[in-house]
């Protein structure tokens, strides 16, 4: 068994941010077609969803994708996308824990639960502009209507026998799942979307080339300023495997997702499609861990969406490296192929972390990317809670925007963090806390770490050094709890990523 990664994670250090290229110019990367997973086709189109729902939305509320309104000479941004696997693919998902779950979230979680650990899907339909959230039973029926239509189009022999909502609700079919993002409290314009589906599902329209994937990523966008898509390719055993990831998000970002078990808008959506031969149950466990340390560790504004969804598909179509040796198992499982699964899980986790960073960098009005690393806590959950509290503090975020090394705000937000219980009980010890600002990795200047608090005691701060450190777009904050009440037994750590609050955030959200 051997293993090699073909792509490495790059760093973008840019200072001062005012002199940088646009986010789209910096973060939209050319996709190498050879790194796209085998056995997937995508399509996208403009259905006019925003225009269709505009009469029932507030004129003062920016519709989803306000920042992406096309110039009169430009083609409108696509707002519906379809991803299709050539064979039924293993499926895994994590979903918002918001009580007001949107209709597509309810549909997906119900379908996956009914299908059990061997769930399979053929396609993912996604729309932007309307969240289909807080729309009651009618919202569920609208989702099912569109899912049924896509399923029928992908199975031409069944086009004359499309099941009714009641019939499909009794089945455990997960052939098609749907994701939605946009304005809350407004019904999907089903007719507008439905009339595009035959076009989207046409063999002549479904494509696998990079431009098609990029357009699909654009269809996911709401207040995003650039499409977010990355690929990874690696060899596992005798298979050359690939993963493509698409996600979106810029506002209403503070996910806390788990597996299935007013005029606000925006959300976090993501799809990761791989050709690796991974079973559904194993894929779910890999996705759970990847999301735990990536998407569940970011925040833009502290607001959890009704629609947050990450889906992962695995269709097993990865090509063999050695064509004379094709006896690789159909699907890898943790019990029978632990090395393969562990290496795949690391690739998925690394890609999820990279994709989650793109959401933070594209946060509404964001001018700073802030990493908060909390270490030497009692448990991971406690370190995560403290890092989250710091990252969501409006005062901390404003200080980062003002390039102010305000350790007091960091300390304050750490002190009121809501800590999960542990046995024995663990508490933060104020006399042990260290707060240090670190220079960004690969920065061109010879900068040293800047301690602002040591053992709970404020330090004299070199303001010139502080200003230089915080003038970077990327700011790194290290909070060492030195074990707290557990002393040397407190060794857990967590990393969170957030952005600053700028005047532009208020403008976008007004």
UniProtKB/Swiss-Prot annotation:
<feature type="active site" description="Nucleophile">
    <location>
        <position position="267"/>
    </location>
</feature>
<comment type="function">
    <text>Catalyzes two activities which are involved in the cyclic version of arginine biosynthesis: the synthesis of acetylglutamate from glutamate and acetyl-CoA, and of ornithine by transacetylation between acetylornithine and glutamate.</text>
</comment>
<feature type="site" description="Cleavage; by autolysis">
    <location>
        <begin position="266"/>
        <end position="267"/>
    </location>
</feature>
<dbReference type="GO" id="GO:0004042">
    <property type="term" value="F:L-glutamate N-acetyltransferase activity"/>
</dbReference>
<comment type="subunit">
    <text>Heterodimer of an alpha and a beta chain.</text>
</comment>
<keyword id="KW-0055">Arginine biosynthesis</keyword>
<keyword id="KW-0012">Acyltransferase</keyword>
<dbReference type="GO" id="GO:0006592">
    <property type="term" value="P:ornithine biosynthetic process"/>
</dbReference>
<feature type="compositionally biased region" description="Polar residues">
    <location>
        <begin position="57"/>
        <end position="70"/>
    </location>
</feature>
<feature type="site" description="Involved in the stabilization of negative charge on the oxyanion by the formation of the oxyanion hole">
    <location>
        <position position="182"/>
    </location>
</feature>
<keyword id="KW-0028">Amino-acid biosynthesis</keyword>
<feature type="binding site">
    <location>
        <position position="222"/>
    </location>
    <ligand>
        <name>substrate</name>
    </ligand>
</feature>
<dbReference type="InterPro" id="IPR042195">
    <property type="entry name" value="ArgJ_beta_C"/>
</dbReference>
<comment type="similarity">
    <text>Belongs to the ArgJ family.</text>
</comment>
<dbReference type="GO" id="GO:0004358">
    <property type="term" value="F:glutamate N-acetyltransferase activity"/>
</dbReference>
<feature type="binding site">
    <location>
        <position position="364"/>
    </location>
    <ligand>
        <name>substrate</name>
    </ligand>
</feature>
<dbReference type="GO" id="GO:0006526">
    <property type="term" value="P:L-arginine biosynthetic process"/>
</dbReference>
<comment type="pathway">
    <text>Amino-acid biosynthesis; L-arginine biosynthesis; L-ornithine and N-acetyl-L-glutamate from L-glutamate and N(2)-acetyl-L-ornithine (cyclic): step 1/1.</text>
</comment>
<dbReference type="GO" id="GO:0005759">
    <property type="term" value="C:mitochondrial matrix"/>
</dbReference>
<keyword id="KW-0511">Multifunctional enzyme</keyword>
<dbReference type="InterPro" id="IPR016117">
    <property type="entry name" value="ArgJ-like_dom_sf"/>
</dbReference>
<protein>
    <recommendedName>
        <fullName>Arginine biosynthesis bifunctional protein ArgJ, mitochondrial</fullName>
        <ecNumber>2.3.1.35</ecNumber>
        <ecNumber>2.3.1.1</ecNumber>
    </recommendedName>
</protein>
<keyword id="KW-0068">Autocatalytic cleavage</keyword>
<feature type="binding site">
    <location>
        <position position="248"/>
    </location>
    <ligand>
        <name>substrate</name>
    </ligand>
</feature>
<keyword id="KW-0496">Mitochondrion</keyword>
<keyword id="KW-0808">Transferase</keyword>
<feature type="site" description="Involved in the stabilization of negative charge on the oxyanion by the formation of the oxyanion hole">
    <location>
        <position position="181"/>
    </location>
</feature>
<dbReference type="InterPro" id="IPR002813">
    <property type="entry name" value="Arg_biosynth_ArgJ"/>
</dbReference>
<feature type="region of interest" description="Disordered">
    <location>
        <begin position="57"/>
        <end position="76"/>
    </location>
</feature>
<comment type="pathway">
    <text>Amino-acid biosynthesis; L-arginine biosynthesis; N(2)-acetyl-L-ornithine from L-glutamate: step 1/4.</text>
</comment>
<dbReference type="Pfam" id="PF01960">
    <property type="entry name" value="ArgJ"/>
</dbReference>
<feature type="binding site">
    <location>
        <position position="267"/>
    </location>
    <ligand>
        <name>substrate</name>
    </ligand>
</feature>
């Amino acid at each position: 068994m051997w293993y090699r990664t073909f792509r490495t994670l790059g760093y973008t250090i840019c200072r001062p941010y005012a002199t940088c290229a646009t986010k789209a110019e910096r973060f939209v990367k050319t996709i190498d077609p050879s790194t796209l997973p085998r056995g997937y086709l995508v399509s996208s189109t403009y259905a006019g969803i925003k225009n269709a729902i505009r009469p029932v939305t507030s004129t003062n509320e920016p519709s989803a994708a306000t920042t992406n309104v096309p110039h009169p000479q430009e083609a409108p941004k696509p707002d519906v996308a379809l991803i299709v696997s050539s064979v039924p693919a293993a499926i895994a998902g994590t979903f918002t824990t918001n009580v007001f779950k949107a209709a597509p979230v309810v549909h997906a979680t119900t379908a996956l639960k009914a299908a059990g650990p061997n769930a399979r899907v053929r396609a993912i339909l996604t729309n932007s502009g309307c969240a289909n959230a807080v729309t009651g039973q009618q919202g569920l029926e609208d989702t099912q209507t569109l899912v049924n239509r896509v399923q029928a189009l992908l199975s031409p022999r069944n086009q004359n026998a499309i099941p009714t909502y009641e019939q499909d609700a009794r089945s455990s079919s997960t052939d098609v799942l749907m994701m939605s993002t946009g304005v809350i409290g407004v019904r999907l314009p089903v007719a507008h979307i439905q009339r595009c589906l035959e076009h989207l599902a046409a063999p002549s329209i479904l494509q696998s080339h990079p431009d098609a994937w990029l357009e699909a990523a654009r269809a996911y966008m709401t207040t995003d300023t650039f499409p977010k898509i990355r690929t990874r390719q690696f060899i596992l055993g005798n298979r050359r495997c690939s993963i493509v990831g698409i996600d979106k998000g810029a506002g209403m970002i503070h996910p806390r997702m788990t597996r299935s078990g007013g005029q606000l808008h925006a959300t976090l959506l993501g799809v990761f499609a791989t050709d690796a031969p991974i079973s559904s149950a194993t894929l779910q466990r890999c996705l759970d861990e990847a999301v735990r340390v990536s998407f569940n560790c970011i925040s833009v504004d502290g607001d959890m969406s009704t629609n947050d969804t990450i889906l992962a598909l695995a269709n097993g179509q990865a090509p063999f490296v050695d064509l004379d040796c094709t006896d690789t198992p159909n699907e890898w499982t943790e019990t029978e192929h632990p090395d393969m699964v562990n290496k795949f899980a690391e690739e998925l986790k690394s890609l999820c972390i990279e994709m989650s960073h793109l959401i933070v960098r594209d946060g509404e009005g964001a001018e700073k990317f802030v990493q908060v690393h909390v270490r030497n806590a009692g448990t991971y959950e406690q370190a995560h809670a403290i890092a989250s509290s710091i990252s969501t503090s409006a005062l901390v975020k404003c200080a980062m925007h003002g390039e102010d090394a305000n350790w007091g705000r960091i300390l304050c937000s750490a002190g009121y963090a809501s800590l999960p219980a542990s046995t024995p009980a663990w508490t933060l010890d104020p006399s042990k806390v260290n707060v240090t600002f670190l220079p960004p990795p690969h920065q061109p200047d010879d900068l040293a770490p800047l301690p602002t608090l040591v053992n709970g005691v404020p330090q004299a701060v070199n303001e010139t050094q502080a200003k230089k450190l915080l003038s970077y777009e990327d700011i790194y904050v290290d909070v060492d709890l030195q074990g707290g009440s557990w002393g040397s037994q407190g060794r857990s750590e967590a990393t969170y990523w957030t952005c600053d609050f700028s005047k532009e955030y208020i403008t976008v959200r007004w």
